[in-house]
Amino acid sequence: MATLPLSLIFAFKNRPKCVITRAQYVKVMAWQEVTAKRSNELGSPTRRKSSIQELVFLEDDVQALNEAFPQGEKADTSWAVTVLFYLAKLVFGILGLALSIIWLLHIIVFMLVNPPAFPFLNQVFIQLDSAWGLLGTTAFAIFCYYLIMSVISGEMHSIHPMKYQGTLMNSFLFNVAIILLCSTR
């Protein structure tokens, strides 16, 4: 339950702070071009595997560079959207951290202690439902959705990391099995 909020907060912390100059952009692109050419020279199978890893890191670097140096006619708008996107990540990271702490408190107070010390979230949802019929259900849905998103975030980071057009089918099926296992009950 910690990976989702912490990854959002760290994404804000490691965001591009300002737009880089054209000279810096050209310098970094030249370095990335040299790295790409070097990784194209395939040799032994171990070299191929390290080349694939280098290409994945290179793609990440190119994406980070494109965020730091927006191009095109609407470069200012693109930079503003990038800044707002990282601020939204910070806000959702802080909210997620609060939800994680609440879930952990509920697990400790209600589930680990026998008999339960206090019906923490159960009582909160009942009180919200008595205030307005759909409020308790909505809060419960938000908490459940957050748990599923935490599972998805955690398994994408550690067990079998998933990348767009870079995940093997067996890794994808393993991740789907974990999500289905966590969503049943």
Curated annotation (Swiss-Prot):
<comment type="subunit">
    <text>Homodimer and heterodimers.</text>
</comment>
<feature type="transmembrane region" description="Helical">
    <location>
        <begin position="132"/>
        <end position="152"/>
    </location>
</feature>
<comment type="similarity">
    <text>Belongs to the Casparian strip membrane proteins (CASP) family.</text>
</comment>
<protein>
    <recommendedName>
        <fullName>CASP-like protein SELMODRAFT_413556</fullName>
    </recommendedName>
</protein>
<feature type="topological domain" description="Extracellular">
    <location>
        <begin position="111"/>
        <end position="131"/>
    </location>
</feature>
<keyword id="KW-0472">Membrane</keyword>
<feature type="topological domain" description="Extracellular">
    <location>
        <position position="185"/>
    </location>
</feature>
<dbReference type="GO" id="GO:0005886">
    <property type="term" value="C:plasma membrane"/>
</dbReference>
<keyword id="KW-0812">Transmembrane</keyword>
<feature type="transmembrane region" description="Helical">
    <location>
        <begin position="164"/>
        <end position="184"/>
    </location>
</feature>
<keyword id="KW-1133">Transmembrane helix</keyword>
<feature type="topological domain" description="Cytoplasmic">
    <location>
        <begin position="153"/>
        <end position="163"/>
    </location>
</feature>
<dbReference type="Pfam" id="PF04791">
    <property type="entry name" value="LMBR1"/>
</dbReference>
<dbReference type="InterPro" id="IPR006876">
    <property type="entry name" value="LMBR1-like_membr_prot"/>
</dbReference>
<feature type="transmembrane region" description="Helical">
    <location>
        <begin position="90"/>
        <end position="110"/>
    </location>
</feature>
<keyword id="KW-1003">Cell membrane</keyword>
<feature type="topological domain" description="Cytoplasmic">
    <location>
        <begin position="1"/>
        <end position="89"/>
    </location>
</feature>
